[in-house]
Amino acid sequence: DRMLDIENPQRIFIRGERQAILKEDMAASDKVRIQYASKYAQSSNYWKNSIGMSRGIRKLNVKAQKEAQEAAFRKWAEANTLPTEGYMDALDRIREAVEGNASAFAAEQVLREALYRAVEILTPARSFLAVEKITDPARSKEAMRAFYKDYNPATDRRVAKRMMQIVKEKCGDLPTVFAEVIDKRFGGDTDAYVDYLYDNSIFATEEGTLAFVDDFSVEKRDADPAVVFVRSLDAKLLELADAQRENNRRFKDGHRLYIAGLMRMQPDKAWASDANFTIRLTYGRVLPYDPADGIRYNYYTTLKGVM
């Protein structure tokens, strides 16, 4: 439910909004198109994955299959195991953990998708957060030049305005900068705040950032509006992650018991191992895919089909 109701819809919407802005600016300028082609592709990769995943889960009726599996497991656990073994309440642990984390998970995802990943000016600002003294200015400048080579401030400003609107509308737990700065100084007008940030931040331009490297000071860094914002954002993300920690542990314990119970319930079934962090070998027959009546996807692509 969390994937279909929260995670995928939020990712699809937020990335779709950002990608629409990138696409407009890329179409209007060859320079921006070159700068943002890779960024657009990277963002759209998991955006398309989320769309396809949600569609496939619904079309293949995966939820009903999982519910049937859980009902069979619960019946087996009650008839064949002791309460002390933990199998009887494994599914309850999972459900309680997911429900307990729902609001914090949703808020964290909105902040990560809309601000942490989408607003680029925060990247150079964040890179100086822990710096007390620049010991290798040449290396710092090299890193900053690499960032600004593929950065367009006007595009990022447009993205930031839309993302801030989305965060204000959809995030149930906002960073303190919204109440302490945006509401108090800008009357809640996120567009006006974004203009202030980009007009006054050192990190809005390559020239400003390189000059800052030459004349670095902690006081100048801490007063920068992008640094103020990123510190508030990171503090809220840490707070939301901490709020989910206990339920994440409960989920992990419940899931471990559920999988162990399924293996015990079906001892003759061949269970695939977890493929994460392993070298994977695939073998068998390669065949076309028939997702629905009258629809067939072949396992190869032809030039005629592409054109």
Regions found by a protein language model. Give the residues of each.
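Terminal presequence/propeptide segments associated with secretion/organelle targeting
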Residues: 1-307
